[in-house]
């Protein structure tokens, strides 16, 4: 999920910086409120020694320590203010995911791809868990050396963009319409050899912005998109918000519409699509895709 264009996008820098500053202000405000509410209503009759003892017992030695900025937010603020490299999604595209994160964070956020925007996603999900799945081990080393707090897994894909038509045909088979743990799926599109944590976590948001998919020999996002839908359907209850980037390309366009379903699509903004997929385990007999209603009537 590295930068796809060298062009400078100042609006994105402003947006990211503003978002992080808002998070910082909210965090500090909550910390101050919490600190104030934990103090006695009146200290008129307490001696200075008693006040110091009580303050120590409250576990918050000084106001400065209580309101210290989280490392993830300070790292993000410094990085995006000083960096000329901006995330590859536009202001409007990032806004789609941010609105959902504003409602759901802190949450479990799975991101296919590790890149220049990863620190932003982790910061917008402050207090939650953000896991990045990346195919390039050398790239993981570069990014995590700079930001060691980012959590990432190295994975290997066995597909190629040039085989996408065959994989689409395969995906229409009955085996690929069955909902199960991807590790037990009989569909060859399912990703089955990833770390156990990938399958066993209940993901609230999934972003598909990798693996590489801009040339015929690249792995492509066919399996990533299919598996994202399978993880969402196979969760015990609730729903999962799934985002797919680069839907201007044939693979991302066709595979997201087919396996995440047009009926589950909530929004498309630029090259980003947002789907909300409910648990299929919570209601038996739910079709793989919802029945689409002709809105022209």
From Swiss-Prot:
Topology term for the membrane: Single-pass membrane protein
Protein name per the record: Glucuronoxylan 4-O-methyltransferase 3
Keywords in alphabetical order: Golgi apparatus, Membrane, Methyltransferase, S-adenosyl-L-methionine, Transferase, Transmembrane, Transmembrane helix
Tissue localization of expression: Expressed in hypocotyls, roots, rosette leaves, stems and siliques.
Recorded catalytic activity of this chain's protein: glucuronoxylan D-glucuronate + n S-adenosyl-L-methionine = glucuronoxylan 4-O-methyl-D-glucuronate + n S-adenosyl-L-homocysteine + n H(+)
Bridged cysteine pairs (disulfide): none
Region (Disordered): 35-63
Function, as annotated: Methyltransferase catalyzing 4-O-methylation of glucuronic acid side chains on xylan.
TM helices/strands, residue ranges: 9-29
Segments of skewed composition (Low complexity): 35-47
A GO MF label: glucuronoxylan 4-O-methyltransferase activity
Subcellular locations according to the entry: Golgi apparatus membrane
Alphabetical list of Pfam families matching this protein: IRX15_IRX15L_GXM (PF21729)
Gene Ontology cellular component annotations, sorted alphabetically: Golgi apparatus; Golgi membrane
PANTHER family, sorted: OS11G0490100 PROTEIN
EC number(s) per entry: 2.1.1.112
Domain of life of the native organism: Eukaryota
Sequence similarity: Belongs to the methyltransferase superfamily.
Gene name for this UniProt entry: GXM3
Observed effect of gene inactivation: No visible phenotype; due to the redundancy with GXM1 and GXM2. Reduced levels of methylated glucuronic acids. Gxm2 and gxm3 double mutants show reduced stem mechanical strength.
GO BP terms: lignin metabolic process; methylation; polysaccharide metabolic process; xylan biosynthetic process; xylan metabolic process
Origin species: Arabidopsis thaliana
Classification via InterPro entries: IRX15/GXM/AGM (IPR006514), SAM-dependent_MTases_sf (IPR029063)
